[in-house]
Structure formats: C-alpha cells, structure tokens
Regions:
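Transmembrane helix-loop-helix hairpins at membrane boundaries of multipass inner-membrane proteins
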Residues: 1-105, 180, 184-186
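Alpha-helical multi-pass transmembrane bundles of energy-transducing inner-membrane proteins
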Residues: 105-109, 113-195
Length: 196
C-alpha cells in the first residue's frame, strides 16, 4: 500500500480544482465572508501552482483502458498558468466590488476550469474542463438577469457549444489515431483532427 506523504500531496494539488471548490464555497457564504474569499482563492491557487514541479501529476484511472491525466506541466503550460494566475489575482481584486454572489462564485469556477484546460494532459480532462468553462462563463454573462444579458448569454453559449462540439469531434478523431494522451498533438498537424 502506497503511503501519501506531504511531498506527494503537494504534487497532486490541482490549482484549477482548488479554484472551482472556492467558487462553489463563495456562492454559499454571506457577503462578509465572500469578499475576502474571492481574493484569497486566486492567492491560494497561485501558491498551489508555484508548488508544482514537472513531476507533478494527478492521474485518475477511469477504466483499465482509459487513464485521465489532470496535470501535465511543461514550460508552455507553466507560462500560461503563471499569466492566468496573475489575471486571477487581478480579477479577485476586481471581484471585491462585485455584489452578486453567483457572479463572484462562477467567475472563480470559470477561472479554475480554464486552469484545468491549461494543465490537461489528456483529451477527456481537456473536454471536461472546456465544458465547465463554457457554462460558468455563460452564467457570468447572465448574472445581471435582464433581457439583454439573457440574449447575450444565449448567443455566447451557442457559439461556445459550436466550438466545443468541433473540439470534441477533433479530439475523438485524434483519440482514434493517437490515443487519449495529448503528447502526439504535433504529429497530426495538417490532418482534419488538428484543424477541428
């Protein structure tokens, strides 16, 4: 039986999942607790990201044939994550003035899901986090609850659903040829799965 040490636990912390959990907690709390947490969430997430190394991994075996890799950290993902963590901290500062609990919480869920997309090491985790980001961002647009925001969020979800379906078709084609791992993505340049 494998022992879970503190070092092993630190390499398994997924910044995106931490941010998503904070987002749902923020939606449940009263306003006095919501404001500090909306700033604390990106700071904790940035700290968790800075603890990661190239050996960080968060595997999950869905079945004997399907293994999901929620964390794949290379230099490109590290750069994008650093930029996105900075943006998330700035968004947390902006979020201090946001009054609506669901807008504040769903913006954290959206930020966490985009971090999940950046760190995805396989096709399934990529599409899961992609779809979470679609619905979270649609709700952030809809949070004003008036006719204009409802129409804008409907148009947004239609465009995002079309893009998500094209991504899904491309990933299915990619998985058929190369498997679930995203390491061979550069090998399919020029093929239909790459362009979808």
């Amino acid at each position: 039986m494998a022992v879970l040490t503190a070092d092993k636990l630190m390499t398994m912390l997924h910044p995106g999942i931490i941010m998503i959990i904070f987002g749902f907690v923020v939606m449940l709390l009263p306003r006095s607790c919501r404001k500090p947490l909306s700033l604390l969430a990106p700071l904790v997430t940035t700290w968790a990201f800075l603890q990661m190394t190239e050996k960080s991994s968060f595997p999950y075996e869905l079945s004997p044939y399907i293994r999901m890799e929620f964390i794949h950290l290379d230099s490109l993902a590290w750069t994008f994550m650093l930029v996105f963590c900075i943006i998330a901290v700035l968004n947390g500062i902006y979020g201090l003035s946001v009054q609506h609990r669901y807008e504040c919480g769903m913006s954290l869920v959206y930020a966490g899901s985009v971090m999940g997309v950046i760190l995805a090491g396989d096709c399934l985790s990529l599409i899961i986090f992609w779809e979470i980001s679609a619905f979270a961002s649609m709700y952030v647009v809809f949070c004003k609850h008036d006719r204009i925001s409802a129409r804008a969020s409907f148009r947004y979800i239609l465009v995002h659903a079309f893009g998500g379906n094209m991504l899904l078709v491309g990933l299915i084609m990619y998985m058929f040829h190369y498997g679930n791992n995203l390491e061979h993505l550069a090998d399919c340049i020029g093929q239909p799965c790459f362009w979808l």
